[in-house]
Amino acid sequence: MNYDWVVVGAGLYGAVFTQQCVANGKRVLVIDKRNHIGGNCYTETVSGIHVHKYGPHIFHTSNEEIWNYVNQFDFFKPFVFSPLALSGGKTYALPFNMWTFQQLWGVTSPKEAKAIIDVQRYRGKIRNLEDQAKALVGTDVYETLIKDYTAKQWQKHPRDLPAFIIKRLPVRFEYNSNYFNDVYQGIPVNGYTHVILSLIHISEPTR
């Protein structure tokens, strides 16, 4: 059988590309090295619950056209991701915002929070992730919410990691724990695997 396109990888990108090709009359072969489709967005149903096997994925965009497009393939239930971090027996709001700074220092205004961070900010040569983090948010935030998490994630001390890993660290001087700033945020009610299947119109993956 002849195909116009061979798509390697049945994640969101590959599935959307496939759907667009098929919509324009092309024949597409989709292959994936894993024994399932969906890439890292793959969901499997366990006791009626759609489990995100590779960690939670929240779809988010400010583009109405994109939002309307994905909702053709499943209803994306609105969901606001507001994670919490546990450190030293206390919980802290993420991403770093005024709730976080109030929990850390008892401050209630952006001016107070900025003043503390400015005093603690590292101003030397940036040599590694530790320096970069301290330059961005100061010592307290680094020691409480970045150091141990980063070491666990990378299995290395932050001073042994390159600075570029944490160059874009979101810091908000407002009471807003919404992880994303996009207008549209949600999770497909039937899981991402259902979305991928709907996009590529197959019942079983080709391996």
PLM-predicted stretches and their roles:
Residues 1:
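A short, basic/flexible loop-to-alpha-helix module at the beginning of a structural domain
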Residues 22-45:
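Glycine-rich FAD pyrophosphate-binding loop
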Residues 53-57, 185-186:
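A short acidic, glycine-rich active-site loop
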Residues 207:
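A conserved short coil-to-beta-strand element within the FAD-binding core of flavoproteins
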Residues 57-60, 201:
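Histidine-centered active-site/metal-ligand motif
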Residues 42-51, 59-111:
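A conserved beta-strand/loop capping segment in the N-terminal third of enzymes
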Residues 4-30:
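N-terminal Rossmann-like FAD-binding beta1-loop-alpha1 element of flavoenzymes
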Residues 85-93, 99-203:
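Active-site/ligand-binding neighborhood in enzyme catalytic cores
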